[in-house]
Amino acid sequence: MRAVVTVVGADKIGIVAGVTATLAELEANIIEISQTLMSGAFTMMMVVETQNSDFSAFQAELSRKGEALGVNIHVQNEAIFNAMHKL
């Protein structure tokens, strides 16, 4: 499964480390990653690939990590993301 993971919140130390450590624990490989900092607002977008077939559990674990870090983490199946953003 491939997924698009977005992270948004106030910038602070440990966001990238926390999110990527959780992805590693979930055995997800980061295919692409981009992050931006604008006026104290942190955003990161990743395409990840995992063999984890339980998408709901994958989403829930990243959501819990987001709450712990004080950021919003949104996970969407890559195929759905692409279909929604097709011109």
Curated annotation (Swiss-Prot):
InterPro entries: ACT-like_dom_sf, ACT_dom, UPF0237/GcvR_regulator, UPF0237_ACT. It comes from the Bacteria. Pfam families: ACT_6. CDD domains: ACT_1ZPV. Residues 4-76 form the ACT domain. NCBIfam families: PRK00194.1. Belongs to the UPF0237 family. This is UPF0237 protein YjhC. The gene is yjhC.
